């Protein structure tokens, strides 16, 4: 037996180690870091030794056969003409060692595989080996010549309509009922046939593709995808932000024909808007974020999973938005296709906008058409009509309308657009960059509702009734405007065709791009982040994350809102008005007065029903208000909680209401430095914004009626003796407010609104009031800035005339106590010193 360390035994082991070392050298030489020349050189240098090692292992001497084999292996390694030359020398030599010859398979009889194993074409989570018939073919669309992504957008309006608004007689035979049609391929009146078929074909290609795979490719392909929803509820909010900017803020800052704003933050009128078919409410969240408490929204959408999600309004105060679901109010179903819902919503909006209507209406209706994407226009025709009808029902004269549409190929859709074209000053079809380019979505934007559109509204109302009657039948309304009428307006028709064809071309390229991005997962849009920043900057949207508002305790929020103001001010009590202090109300023109119904308190709103009150004493705590009401966060008011009464006798109803005496901070807006009259005006505006007429179960919020002191007599006219429940049938003094509710008055607050050293007087020669500075002796009719008494001056200097026992302010009361200040004394003093 040979030992392990015998020379003959160890020789093969040494040779094997030598071959491993040579192989390592070759691997090093063939690494990707070396240039091709060094790899080839290393391969040449090692070929002979590799062949020799193999021959020694096999126990063969160098002969002609082994030389030929080595030569062939060498040729395989070095052959640049070989289709295998792309592989490094080591892999080629290993194949040569196994007897590989180009064009032949491995094995004794060359029976092995001759072709290289293809790289995997696996796409995402598809089944292994699955190919999607019809999708993997080429679309033959060059999408690479699309315009460079940009934040700048152009608007193209329809020409101004010169045709008169059609009347009832003219439209009497316009509606055409025909056989229900469920094909779109032949709708070529307002789009070229080739383009129409191309876009439908491109859409159909995606029918077999998995939704997730499509969405991933779309996300990478869309240069505007990263804009998303920023800090808003959803992407819809950013669409509205996008279009509001493009259309020169015509929604959040509407202007008249001269360019002057129709509503101003400092003035009393709110910006009224409506949002229909709009759950969960992204459009409204944007408007309320932009306008804050200077806007009031009304909403109607289908109840259910896609209802308004007001609790998710993180960036705006949902207390300024009032959902109303048509017939039945808050208990309705919100179905806009039901005529009774349209009528109920119209009446509700008009009742709460002084019969004027809203400044603008937004509509973003849509529903799932999965599996029938090409028929979306036909399936949603009634929804589109009802949204247009709602605009003509609730938008005020001069107001605006924006509504989502889809494809507009059919004469039915074109007819609806034509009616808007007749009823508004200007109309356009617009696709914002925040709307994904591959979908059929775009918006019809209408500016300036004309006078005299009632007949068109009534006509569309009748068409909707007919559509409801034809449900589940083979018939349908196919036309709302005759084709010859539409085509008779050449400018309108040309615009429709141009818009449709331009939109089709955009869609085709976008769909082809997504198709390419599905097939090649390495493709991506490099400028998404850059475009996002540019758009947000241009639209005035802060680049912030969406986070829920932080909660706070009332005391901390109070100190945050008053911003270092001396807290002792809030503990001041009013000076009692008596015979001794009557002189304090001179000059009379400097003062205003309000009827009191209970103790004054400070009220803070932290959002929704998180409302607390405090009596002003530092030793006392903020107490949760036990009333059913809602206020926007960051609100601080001076109020009374008053028990209001309606009716008399057994039918008398009692309700607790919040009466505002003065305002400090409104939804984060500090108004303490403004004039008292301005603060009261803003308070009334604020109350309109937060009031919920659809919710009679909620406790009301009202602003105290303010009287000029020289007109105090008007207050006594509103006083009467009434029997109040629980008063043993004894009539009590009652004050009746503007809303026909009455309460038991406790006295009169008298507030000075002019700051020292200024005072007010009346010019007999000019018949008007003026301001006079007691120090400088300057007189002026204009309001001097330093004459405005801020909140703390008004609060500190107020007086209170208590109407307790012995004070006779109504003829039916007990006789006046001669030791107390009488009504006659006060009125006489006012009359004497107001002349």
Swiss-Prot record:
GO cellular component: cytoplasm; nucleoplasm; nucleus
EC annotation from Swiss-Prot or TrEMBL: 2.1.1.57
Quaternary structure note: Interacts with POLR2A (via C-terminus).
Protein name per UniProt: Cap-specific mRNA (nucleoside-2'-O-)-methyltransferase 1
InterPro entries: G_patch_dom, mRNA_Cap_2O-Ribose_MeTrfase, RNA_MeTrfase_FtsJ_dom, RrmJ-type_MeTrfase, SAM-dependent_MTases_sf, WW_dom
Keywords: Acetylation, Methyltransferase, mRNA capping, mRNA processing, Nucleus, Phosphoprotein, S-adenosyl-L-methionine, Transferase
Basic and acidic residues: compositionally biased ranges: 57-68
Organism (species): Ailuropoda melanoleuca
Protein origin, superkingdom: Eukaryota
């Amino acid at each position: 037996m040979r030992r392990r360390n015998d020379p003959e035994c160890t020789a093969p082991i040494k040779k094997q180690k030598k071959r491993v070392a040579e192989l390592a050298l070759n691997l090093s030489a063939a690494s990707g870091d070396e240039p091709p020349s060094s790899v080839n050189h290393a391969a040449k240098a090692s070929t002979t030794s590799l062949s020799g090692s193999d021959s020694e292992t096999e126990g063969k001497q160098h002969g002609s056969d082994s030389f030929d084999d080595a030569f062939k292996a060498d040729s395989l390694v070095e052959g640049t003409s070989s289709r295998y030359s792309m592989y490094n020398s080591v892999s080629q030599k290993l194949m040569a060692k196994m007897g590989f010859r180009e064009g032949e398979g491995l094995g004794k009889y060359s029976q092995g595989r001759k072709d290289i194993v293809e790289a995997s074409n696996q796409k995402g989570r598809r089944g292994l080996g699955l190919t999607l018939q019809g999708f993997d073919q080429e679309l033959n669309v060059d999408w690479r010549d699309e315009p460079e992504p940009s934040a700048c957008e152009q608007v193209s309006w329809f020409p101004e309509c010169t045709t008169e608004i059609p009347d009832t007689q003219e439209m009497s035979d316009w509606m055409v009922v025909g056989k229900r049609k469920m094909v779109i391929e032949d709708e070529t009146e307002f789009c070229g046939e080739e383009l129409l078929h191309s876009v439908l074909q491109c859409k159909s290609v995606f029918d077999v593709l998995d939704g997730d795979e499509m969405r991933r490719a779309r996300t990478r392909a869309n240069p505007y995808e990263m804009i998303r929803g920023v800090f808003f509820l959803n992407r819809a909010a950013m669409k509205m932000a996008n279009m509001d900017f493009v259309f020169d803020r015509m929604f959040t800052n509407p202007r008249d024909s001269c360019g002057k704003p129709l509503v101003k933050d400092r003035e009393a009128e709110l910006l009224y808007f409506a949002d229909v078919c709009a759950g969960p409410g992204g459009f409204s969240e944007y408007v309320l974020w932009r306008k804050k408490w200077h806007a009031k929204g009304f909403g109607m959408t289908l109840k259910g999973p896609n209802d308004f999600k007001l609790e998710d309004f993180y960036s705006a105060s949902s207390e300024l938005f009032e959902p109303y679901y048509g017939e039945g109010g808050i208990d309705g179903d919100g179905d806009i296709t039901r005529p009774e819902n349209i009528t109920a919503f119209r009446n509700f909006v008009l009742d709460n906008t002084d019969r004027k209507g809203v400044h603008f209406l937004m509509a973003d209706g849509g529903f799932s058409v999965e599996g029938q994407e090409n028929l979306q226009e036909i399936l949603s025709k009634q929804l589109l009509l009802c949204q247009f009808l709602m605009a003509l029902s609730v938008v005020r004269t001069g107001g605006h309308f924006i509504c989502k549409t889809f494809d507009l190929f059919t004469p039915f859709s074109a007819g609806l657009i034509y009616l808007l074209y007749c009823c508004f000053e200007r109309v356009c079809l617009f696709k914002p960059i925040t709307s994904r380019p591959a979908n059929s979505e775009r918006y019809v934007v209408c500016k300036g509702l004309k006078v005299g559109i009632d007949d068109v509204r009534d006509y569309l109302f009748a068409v909707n009734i007919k559509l409801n009657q034809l449900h589940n039948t083979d018939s349908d309304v196919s036309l709302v405007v005759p084709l010859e009428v539409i085509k008779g307006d050449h400018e309108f028709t040309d615009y429709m065709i141009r818009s449709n064809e331009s939109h089709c071309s955009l869609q085709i390229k976008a769909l082809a791009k997504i198709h390419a991005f599905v097939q090649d997962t390495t493709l991506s849009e490099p400028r998404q982040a850059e475009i996002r920043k540019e758009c947000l900057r241009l639209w005035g949207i802060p680049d912030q994350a969406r986070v829920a508002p932080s909660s706070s305790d009332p005391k901390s929020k109070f100190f945050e809102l008053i911003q270092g103001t001396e807290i002792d001010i809030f503990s001041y009590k009013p000076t009692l008005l008596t015979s001794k202090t009557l002189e304090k109300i001179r000059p009379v023109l400097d003062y205003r007065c309000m009827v009191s119904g209970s103790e004054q308190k400070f009220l803070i709103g932290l959002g929704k029903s998180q409302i607390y009150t405090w009596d002003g004493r530092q030793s006392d705590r903020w107490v949760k208000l036990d009333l059913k009401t809602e206020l926007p966060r960051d609100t601080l008011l001076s109020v009374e909680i008053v028990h209001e009464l309606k009716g008399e006798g057994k039918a008398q109803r009692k309700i607790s209401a919040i009466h505002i005496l003065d305002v400090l901070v409104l939804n984060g807006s500090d108004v303490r430095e403004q004039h008292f009259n301005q603060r009261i005006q803003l308070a009334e505006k604020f109350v309109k914004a937060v009031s919920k007429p659809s919710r009679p179960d909620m406790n009301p919020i009202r602003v105290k009626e303010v009287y000029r002191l020289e007109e105090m007599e008007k207050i006594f006219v509103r006083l009467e003796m009434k029997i109040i429940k629980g008063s043993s049938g004894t009539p009590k003094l009652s004050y009746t407010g503007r809303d026909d509710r009455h309460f038991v008055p406790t006295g009169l607050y008298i507030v000075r609104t002019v700051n020292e050293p200024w005072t007010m007087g009346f010019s007999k020669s000019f018949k008007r009031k003026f301001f006079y500075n007691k120090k400088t002796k300057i007189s002026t009719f204009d309001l001097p800035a330093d004459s405005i008494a801020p909140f703390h001056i008004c609060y500190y200097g107020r007086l209170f005339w208590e109407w307790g026992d012995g004070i006779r302010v109504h003829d039916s009361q007990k006789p006046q106590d001669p030791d107390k200040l009488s009504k006659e004394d006060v009125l006489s003093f006012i009359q004497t010193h107001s002349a």
